[in-house]
Amino acid sequence: MRGLGLWLLGAMMLPAIAPSRPWALMEQYEVVLPWRLPGPRVRRALPSHLGLHPERVSYVLGATGHNFTLHLRKNRDLLGSGYTETYTAANGSEVTEQPRGQDHCFYQGHVEGYPDSAASLSTCAGLRGFFQVGSDLHLIEPLDEGGEGGRHAVYQAEHLLQTAGTCGVSDDSLGSLLGPRTAAVFRPRPGDSLPSRETRYVELYVVVDNAEFQMLGSEAAVRHRVLEVVNHVDKLYQKLNFRVVLVGLEIWNSQDRFHVSPDPSVTLENLLTWQARQRTRRHLHDNVQLITGVDFTGTTVGFARVSAMCSHSSGAVNQDHSKNPVGVACTMAHEMGHNLGMDHDENVQGCRCQERFEAGRCIMAGSIGSSFPRMFSDCSQAYLESFLERPQSVCLANAPDLSHLVGGPVCGNLFVERGEQCDCGPPEDCRNRCCNSTTCQLAEGAQCAHGTCCQECKVKPAGELCRPKKDMCDLEEFCDGRHPECPEDAFQENGTPCSGGYCYNGACPTLAQQCQAFWGPGGQAAEESCFSYDILPGCKASRYRADMCGVLQCKGGQQPLGRAICIVDVCHALTTEDGTAYEPVPEGTRCGPEKVCWKGRCQDLHVYRSSNCSAQCHNHGVCNHKQECHCHAGWAPPHCAKLLTEVHAASGSLPVFVVVVLVLLAVVLVTLAGIIVYRKARSRILSRNVAPKTTMGRSNPLFHQAASRVPAKGGAPAPSRGPQELVPTTHPGQPARHPASSVALKRPPPAPPVTVSSPPFPVPVYTRQAPKQVIKPTFAPPVPPVKPGAGAANPGPAEGAVGPKVALKPPIQRKQGAGAPTAP
């Protein structure tokens, strides 16, 4: 039976060649029946935020004669904390909402037994996505409505029939924007490791036009398509130590908000102009991407601005040109690469793509071949690192709000969140020996696991360089010896002289630099006389300015696409992105000796420079752009007056005044505790001494009952007392001792009984019941009355007389049916 079960399992995992193609877009494929591996048992009632899809899932499927085991984890970082969706309601009004229960079915992972493998799939309605093994990229999608266990097609990208696509960013425009590149700049990186810098984050906003909505048919289908695409893009960028987080989705289900032209350059300019007008109304983001169902002219499938990330021009347009979402995901990753400063691989001599030529090209190839790319080339990584050195890229260092990521903190998502000391990804992908990937806690003996000031699981010593100086307006940063992260990036003090200008927030703005940024390398600042013009909307020029802080005037270069210009003589003014005004001279630009443009006027440097800031740094540092001391290596902030080693040593022991405060606080607490204890004890003592009712032998009711009812045999019987009252033995020759008490008796003591010959009185029989507790008096117990006429001491017993006096004992208790007590 077991052999039959294994045979059936093997039959399920082996692929079956389909007798016919399900659609004409696929040239060759294999039919597989994925088998989901049983996961660990969980409670039936899952928390609501976990949704219907598990955090982890594994599938076994067969393709190309092999059985592949895919281990997947839900991409909890796919959606940002403030993720919103915008669409048009039935009444025509625009609706923006944050969906509740943002659970999804998009996963990332790896293939068991294959190093450097990758997988990105959705499990919403069957399996759809890709998994990479070595240089082979396998695509999978369902063939029927059988769900995850139904028939699926597995094929390689080159077997998907599609037209070749190209990037609309021309090589000429790239060359003019990026300048010449040599092979020496792009030496191959040793190994295939991630960059050692901190993780960068792209907060993405996606717009879907009406043509795409009509093609997919519903808002739900659009949402699913976009999440699939972004999930793939995020997976592609993870190898560059980047994360792509979707913070907003806008679906034009009614009509387009601007004209989507078949000309991709026009559509891009319309997108950026619309974004500039709507930016304050939309979720804050770093990059906007349009996905359109419009067929662009020629072979172009994407168009983007180069090196525009973190600016108002940060965006791109993408044609949804493939039935498989991996196709548009690769296009979006390519265009986003242009936004990050990357050039086409073909334009760089010596650029190396680690992919085999027959397996496909890298992501930044100028055209898409028969297979989808899956990695970035060496030169693309070098371009990226160069872009990240610019002050412009600062927006990428801002991580999303980790405390509000959709799904909450999850160990293994590469985000160090609440309750975690480190996060190196899932156990199968983690290569960081300083971090326990299953608990996201530091390994035993490790001080750190991440950060540029962390080396071999230890924090680097104070004074080691962790961020070098990039240019004249930058400052180098050093490790402080206590934290694994490099201190915040700081710049020279605003107003510090630099090449042809003065530093301002880490840049050296000059007129020539600004003209080159807009008009390309050939752009130059126009003659000084041009700056005396003020250009009003509609290209109305008026000559009355007395400084050079009005409209930016340039000459030479190439006119930017989608921008209108105003030409006055040899002066060229460029319209802003929204077309409502003309580009001004940026703040901080030099307008004369010791003068800069500030709030539209040419003013003295002292408008933002403190004359005595650096004097506070004790000659061991300089003032930075925040008017704070930036200390030299080994010196401690805030005023660079002490060495870091001295500060760290002093921090190991508490200051004297802190010790004094702690001692005084301890004394006060002990005193208060003593007062409280004393008051409680005193109150208990007083409560016991509040006039207790005295129980005396003379007031014992049993005494009176015995004396009045039954005379004692031959003398007075000892009065009955409670079990806790002891009366000392009194001899006849001793006087009776009265109790030392100030309480006066209200009635005289009873007269001694007369000796009568009578049978002994019966002793009452009591049930076994606990005697009633009485308060023990604080004075001596009473002495029983002495028999009158007592003779000499110690008389011998005589007939009819009682024996010596003994302490009063409680009545003898007998069980029912017992005989009468015998005389003692």
Swiss-Prot record:
InterPro entries: ADAM_Cys-rich, Disintegrin_CS, Disintegrin_dom, Disintegrin_dom_sf, EGF-like_dom, MetalloPept_cat_dom_sf, Peptidase_M12B, Peptidase_M12B_N. Its cofactor is Zn(2+). It comes from the Eukaryota. Its EC number is 3.4.24.-. Residues 788-804 have a biased composition (Low complexity). Residues 17-655 are extracellular. Gene3D superfamilies: 3.40.1620.60, Collagenase (Catalytic Domain), Disintegrin domain. It is found in: Membrane. The chain crosses the membrane at residues 656-676. Residues 747-756 have a biased composition (Pro residues). The keyword Acyltransferase does not apply. Keywords: Disulfide bond, EGF-like domain, Glycoprotein, Hydrolase, Membrane, Metal-binding, Metalloprotease, Protease, Signal, Transmembrane, Transmembrane helix, Zinc. Residues 1-16 form the signal peptide. The active site is at E335. Binds 1 zinc ion per subunit. Glycans are attached at N67, N91, N436, N612. GO terms for biological process: angiogenesis; canonical NF-kappaB signal transduction; cell morphogenesis; cell-cell adhesion; cellular response to hypoxia; extracellular matrix disassembly; inflammatory response; leukocyte migration involved in inflammatory response. Residues 677-824 are cytoplasmic. Disulfide bonds join C310-C395, C351-C379, C353-C362, C435-C457, C448-C454, C466-C486, C473-C503, C498-C508, C566-C613, C613-C623, C617-C629, C631-C640. Residues 200-400 form the Peptidase M12B domain. Possible involvement in extravasation of leukocytes. This is Disintegrin and metalloproteinase domain-containing protein 8.
